[in-house]
Amino acid sequence: MVSSNQDLLISPSIPYGEIAVPPSKSHSLRAILFASLSKGTSIIENCLFSPDSQAMLTACEKMGAHVRRIGDSLHIQGNPDPHHCHPRYFHMGNSGIALRFLTALSTLSPTPTLITGSHTLKRRPIAPLLSSLKQLGAHIRQKTSSSIPFTIHGPLSPGHVTISGQDSQYASALAITAALAPYPLSFSIENLKERPWFDLTLDWLHSLNISFLRDQDSLTFPGGQSLESFSYSVPGDYSSAAFLASFGLLSSSSKPTILRNLSSQDSQGDKLLFSLLKQLGAHILIGKHHIEMHPSSFSGGEIDMDPFIDALPILAVLCCFAKNPSRLYNALGAKDKESNRIEAIAHELQKMGGSVHPTRDGLYIKPSRLHGAVVDSHNDHRIAMALAVAGVHASSGQTLLCNTQCINKSFPYFVIAAQTLHANVRHYQADFPLRSSFCR
């Protein structure tokens, strides 16, 4: 294996310090989309600028929004009636949110839209959403029923449909579309997973004065509603915070790691991870706008992953350092993310000496001493950052983490952030084979 400047060289170190958490990817993408569909000009402060954000911005500009970037803020003049544009082509990059949300919104237009994306986006399931949209009258042409590319257009017909809840983005996409449809639409969610992330979408709609009725997992939208412009400051990303927090929690330092730019009132699903760690015995202080991590030991256990399924890779690393074995379960959806995260994190941690084994719907993990190794990100940002944490807290040896460009998806300045916390993580480039250099 030959290293490139997309690789990271990681050495055991003792992290501590204070840092601002990057803006939330989930909130940034929703803010961009809603601003682009609103009347007037919206201002989004502290927006995350990443490949996913750019994919969403590009698509929204094709729908008629006018976007101006000023520093870390966006001024977006929306187009509340984007559905009578010329035929459109949306390249979603590697963004699952953009794929699902804009696919559903495209059915409000009689104009065909070609939906495509990166090679890795083709592995992200879309069939359950397309099936429900077809039942409402959407016209879809595709070469394969399971992935992009495809052409889609409406109009939809008023009615009721059932949507799979296996991925919360299906239900979120349908809710956003129903909110802006000119006619009544209702739907029921079958076996809703990742509930906090669907609730986050509904919180957004509620804050934008969209009316709907909710009876458990059935929702009814009256039709004929529109969005008004707004000002919004994106809070910190709890999913990204989990990696920074893990640097500090596993450290042998006597000093804490303090994470700022977080809102205790936020509905992000991965916020619940910090409450879980506290319940397991970790020394964590949760403030209104910050979290303070003190190096401490904690127990493993039986952990239902559904509320924070994106945290599976980093929780797998943490459980290697727990006082007793752990079983992470109810995480089938982790198989359909940017990688099969269950298989990917198990495979890579096994290289580092971890006793991490896939199960039908998660992982079984025994406490393990990790060592340096050559590992790979599987082109998945959360796998990459979890392995960086593992490398920093390995008991011996350096870790070469390959193919880390994917980290830009949610945390473009991850390496700088790690270094700010005194973690020995740096870009690495060499012109010779490296594998033998990283053996124990």
UniProtKB/Swiss-Prot annotation:
Catalytic reaction list: 3-phosphoshikimate + phosphoenolpyruvate = 5-O-(1-carboxyvinyl)-3-phosphoshikimate + phosphate
UniProt cross-references to CDD domains, sorted A to Z: EPSP_synthase
InterPro entries named among the record's database cross-references: Enolpyruvate_Tfrase_dom, Enolpyruvate_Tfrase_sf, EPSP_synthase, EPSP_synthase_CS, RNA3'P_cycl/enolpyr_Trfase_a/b
Binding site for 3-phosphoshikimate: 25-26, 30, 168-169, 310, 337
The protein's annotated pathway: Metabolic intermediate biosynthesis; chorismate biosynthesis; chorismate from D-erythrose 4-phosphate and phosphoenolpyruvate: step 6/7
Coiled coil start-end: none
Subunit structure: Monomer.
Role summary: Catalyzes the transfer of the enolpyruvyl moiety of phosphoenolpyruvate (PEP) to the 5-hydroxyl of shikimate-3-phosphate (S3P) to produce enolpyruvyl shikimate-3-phosphate and inorganic phosphate.
Family membership noted in the UniProt record: Belongs to the EPSP synthase family.
Protein name: 3-phosphoshikimate 1-carboxyvinyltransferase
Taxonomic classification: Bacteria, Pseudomonadati, Chlamydiota, Chlamydiia, Chlamydiales
Gene: aroA
